[in-house]
Amino acid sequence: SHRGFANLPPGVLVYAVEGPFFFGAVETFERTLAATHTDPRVLIIRLRWVPFIDITGLQTLEEVVGDLHKRGVTVLLSGANERVLGKLRRAGIVAQVGEENVFGDVAAALQAATVAAR
């Protein structure tokens, strides 16, 4: 969902994943991204409300990030808890997005996104 981010810089989109990132949530995530039609320059995937992520979530995230990168979209991750971040590291997703594109909170990610979208 993108609620609460009315004043996003041009070219920046925030997608908040809410709840466990597993099989059911993955379909919604993919559908929502497909529905945007125009690619943002920067997509912030906000993981603050994700208590855990399973293998399906990890695989989907990896595929989505790869697809977005091919389309020239910079992907930033924000707010993942230690457990989720550990899984993202082990799955190679942190390396895929780049350590410099992982942020503790959405405010820091938005600052970086504003610069990256220019």
Residues covered by each model-derived region:
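Structured cytosolic domains appended to multi-pass membrane proteins
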Residues: 1-118
